[in-house]
C-alpha cells in the first residue's frame, strides 16, 4: 500500500491497531499521534466518515464541519497541554525577557495562544483528511528538512481559525508548493531569525531555543 494511504486503518478500524498511536476514537473520529511527529507533540484528528475522509480539507471544511469537530480539537489541545505539564517545567533564565514564558505551563489559554497551532496543509500529502494539532516547538528528530518545517511555518499551513476559506483561490498545488516549501526562507518560529535555506543551522537553533525555555522534570 502506498504511504499516501498510511492513515486508512486509523479511519476504518482504529480498534485493530496494536500500538499506542491511537489516543482516542469513537464513531465519528480517531485522534492519533503522528507516526513522524514534527514537534514534541503532534496529533492528527481523522474524521471517520468516508465521504469526509476522502475530501480535500480546503473544500470540505465549512462552518458546520468546524462546529462538529471543535470538541475533538479541544480534546487534542488538552492532551498536548497535559503532556507538557507532566513532562516539562519552564527553565528560568536571566536572559529570557519574554513575558509569554512566565507561567505558560500553568495557564492553558496562554499556552494554547502562544504554543499550539491547529490546522491543515493546503496541499495534503496523505489521502485521508486530517487536522494537525501540534506544539509550536519543532523539537523533533523527525523534522529533517526544509519542506517539513515550512509546511507548518508558512502560508502552506492554514490555521483552523482561518477556515472555512469560502472559495478563496490559493493557486495550483505546484504554485503553493513552490512558493512556500521551496522558495520561502526558513524563519525561526520563536524569534523570527532568518536562516535562508540553511536548515541544519535552523535545526540547531531550534534545539537551543527549546532547551532555553523547557527542562525535564
From Swiss-Prot:
<dbReference type="GO" id="GO:0033699">
    <property type="term" value="F:DNA 5'-adenosine monophosphate hydrolase activity"/>
</dbReference>
<dbReference type="GO" id="GO:0005634">
    <property type="term" value="C:nucleus"/>
</dbReference>
<keyword id="KW-0539">Nucleus</keyword>
<dbReference type="GO" id="GO:0006974">
    <property type="term" value="P:DNA damage response"/>
</dbReference>
<dbReference type="InterPro" id="IPR036265">
    <property type="entry name" value="HIT-like_sf"/>
</dbReference>
<dbReference type="GO" id="GO:0003725">
    <property type="term" value="F:double-stranded RNA binding"/>
</dbReference>
<dbReference type="GO" id="GO:0003697">
    <property type="term" value="F:single-stranded DNA binding"/>
</dbReference>
<dbReference type="GO" id="GO:0030983">
    <property type="term" value="F:mismatched DNA binding"/>
</dbReference>
<dbReference type="GO" id="GO:0120108">
    <property type="term" value="F:DNA-3'-diphospho-5'-guanosine diphosphatase"/>
</dbReference>
<feature type="binding site">
    <location>
        <position position="205"/>
    </location>
    <ligand>
        <name>Zn(2+)</name>
    </ligand>
</feature>
<feature type="binding site">
    <location>
        <position position="209"/>
    </location>
    <ligand>
        <name>Zn(2+)</name>
    </ligand>
</feature>
<keyword id="KW-0378">Hydrolase</keyword>
<feature type="binding site">
    <location>
        <position position="191"/>
    </location>
    <ligand>
        <name>Zn(2+)</name>
    </ligand>
</feature>
<feature type="region of interest" description="Interaction with DNA">
    <location>
        <begin position="34"/>
        <end position="38"/>
    </location>
</feature>
<keyword id="KW-0238">DNA-binding</keyword>
<keyword id="KW-0479">Metal-binding</keyword>
<feature type="region of interest" description="Interaction with DNA">
    <location>
        <begin position="121"/>
        <end position="132"/>
    </location>
</feature>
<feature type="binding site">
    <location>
        <position position="188"/>
    </location>
    <ligand>
        <name>Zn(2+)</name>
    </ligand>
</feature>
<dbReference type="GO" id="GO:0046872">
    <property type="term" value="F:metal ion binding"/>
</dbReference>
<feature type="site" description="Interaction with DNA">
    <location>
        <position position="10"/>
    </location>
</feature>
<dbReference type="InterPro" id="IPR011146">
    <property type="entry name" value="HIT-like"/>
</dbReference>
<keyword id="KW-0963">Cytoplasm</keyword>
<keyword id="KW-0227">DNA damage</keyword>
<comment type="function">
    <text>DNA-binding protein involved in single-strand DNA break repair, double-strand DNA break repair and base excision repair. Resolves abortive DNA ligation intermediates formed either at base excision sites, or when DNA ligases attempt to repair non-ligatable breaks induced by reactive oxygen species. Catalyzes the release of adenylate groups covalently linked to 5'-phosphate termini, resulting in the production of 5'-phosphate termini that can be efficiently rejoined.</text>
</comment>
<feature type="region of interest" description="Interaction with DNA">
    <location>
        <begin position="144"/>
        <end position="148"/>
    </location>
</feature>
<feature type="domain" description="HIT">
    <location>
        <begin position="6"/>
        <end position="139"/>
    </location>
</feature>
<dbReference type="GO" id="GO:1990165">
    <property type="term" value="F:single-strand break-containing DNA binding"/>
</dbReference>
<keyword id="KW-0862">Zinc</keyword>
<dbReference type="GO" id="GO:0005737">
    <property type="term" value="C:cytoplasm"/>
</dbReference>
<dbReference type="GO" id="GO:0000012">
    <property type="term" value="P:single strand break repair"/>
</dbReference>
<dbReference type="InterPro" id="IPR032566">
    <property type="entry name" value="Znf-C2HE"/>
</dbReference>
<feature type="active site" description="Nucleophile">
    <location>
        <position position="130"/>
    </location>
</feature>
<protein>
    <recommendedName>
        <fullName>Aprataxin-like protein</fullName>
        <ecNumber>3.6.1.71</ecNumber>
        <ecNumber>3.6.1.72</ecNumber>
    </recommendedName>
</protein>
<dbReference type="Pfam" id="PF01230">
    <property type="entry name" value="HIT"/>
</dbReference>
<keyword id="KW-0234">DNA repair</keyword>
<dbReference type="Pfam" id="PF16278">
    <property type="entry name" value="zf-C2HE"/>
</dbReference>
Amino acid at each position: 500500500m502506498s504511504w499516501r494511504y498510511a492513515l486508512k486503518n486509523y479511519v476504518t478500524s482504529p480498534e485493530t491497531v496494536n500500538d499506542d498511536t491511537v489516543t482516542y476514537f469513537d464513531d465519528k473520529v480517531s485522534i492519533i499521534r503522528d507516526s513522524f511527529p514534527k514537534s514534541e507533540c503532534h496529533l492528527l484528528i481523522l474524521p471517520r466518515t468516508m465521504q469526509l475522509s476522502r475530501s480535500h480539507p480546503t473544500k470540505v471544511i465549512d462552518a458546520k464541519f468546524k462546529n462538529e469537530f471543535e470538541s475533538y480539537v479541544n480534546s487534542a489541545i488538552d492532551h498536548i497541554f497535559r503532556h507538557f505539564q507532566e513532562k516539562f517545567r519552564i527553565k528560568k533564565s536571566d536572559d529570557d525577557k519574554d513575558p509569554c514564558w512566565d507561567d505558560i505551563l500553568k495557564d492553558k489559554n496562554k499556552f494554547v495562544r502562544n504554543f499550539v497551532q491547529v490546522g491543515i496543509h493546503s496541499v495534503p500529502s496523505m489521502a485521508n483528511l486530517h487536522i494537525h494539532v501540534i506544539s509550536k516547538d519543532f523539537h523533533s528528530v523527525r523534522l529533517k528538512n526544509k519542506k517539513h518545517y515550512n509546511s507548518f511555518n508558512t502560508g502552506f499551513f492554514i490555521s483552523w481559525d482561518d477556515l472555512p476559506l469560502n472559495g478563496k483561490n490559493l493557486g495550483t498545488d505546484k504554485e503553493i508548493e513552490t512558493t512556500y516549501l521551496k522558495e520561502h526562507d526558513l524563519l525561526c518560529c520563536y524569534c523570527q531569525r532568518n536562516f535562508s535555506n540553511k536548515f541544519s543551522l535552523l535545526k540547531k537553533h531550534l534545539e537551543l531555543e527549546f532547551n532555553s525555555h523547557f527542562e525535564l522534570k
